[in-house]
Amino acid sequence: MQIITLTSDIGLRDFYVASVKGRLLQAVNGAQLIDITHQIKPFDVAEAAYQLRSCYASFPRGTIHMVGVDTEPYLPYKITDPSQENQLTYPSILTYDGHFFISNDNGFIGTFLGEGVPEALYRYVRIEEEPESWTFMMKTCFVDLASNIVNKVPFKDFTVEVNAYKKAFTPNPIIEHNMIQGNVIHIDHFGNIITNIFKHDFERFGLNVPFTISYQKRNYDIDVISKAYNDVTISERVAIFNDTERLEIAINRGANGGNGGADRLFGMRLGEPVRVTFFPKGSVRNLDSLL
């Protein structure tokens, strides 16, 4: 039974998701379809990359991941000047870590990979001859590509192997002497604030080094990493390393629509800065370490 995951920006209000699933079930006999999310902000390939990067490894190798975000290709007939060639986008298949990823090469692939190296990358160039597919690529072209993978059609029979791909802009944390400057990259359903600061960024400064996590809401700094949300009392602020080892700031039992998530209470939005300042031995904050 072939597992196929679906990530898109087409929402749940309309028939679009059902239409994609219906065609997949016709094209791939016995397919097991798993929704990751269809609530990606329209055309936001960076968010799609974050969501899929956070969970793809939970699926067995051989899983096919379809990414229906900003899918319409930008093809050569639209080019009026050679300088525009870097704008070209094609439906592509990425193989990475034993998984298959079908998406438009619109920045998703490079952002998903980060520092990772693809096993292979294939471009579906025949799309230039299939204008009837352009307006709903996830239902048409992407389903056909998934079917070819399942049926073990050789990639050389329907794609061209390439080694270049685009990357959307995503901020990386800035690591300086005694400080990490990061950003909010995602706010989840509970209003929890997820940053681009990883656990390994913390560990570069050594173990048991005092620190302060600061953000927009003054006087609400955090100076401890908890193991679980319930390590603090209900409605208290908490910092943890989440399932993906990213620094997360939350309100215990807080939720948007309830008591209020951390994003509301702290006035945090996507892109807002989050700073971690360390106080190593001998610093003004940590003079006791010299005694």
Where are these regions (language model features)?
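Anionic-ligand-binding alpha/beta catalytic cores of soluble enzymes and soluble regulatory domains
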Residues: 128-207
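Fold-independent oxyanion-binding glycine-rich loops
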Residues: 8-10, 36, 68-71, 96-97, ...
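Conserved glycine-rich phosphate/nucleotide-binding loop
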Residues: 259-291
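N-terminal glycine-rich anion-binding loop in soluble enzyme alpha/beta folds
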Residues: 2-39
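Active-site histidine-anchored catalytic micro-motif
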Residues: 3, 27, 32-33, 45-47, ...
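N-terminal beta-loop-helix "entrance" segment that forms/cooperates
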Residues: 35-55
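A conserved acidic, glycine/proline-rich C-terminal tail/linker
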Residues: 196-269
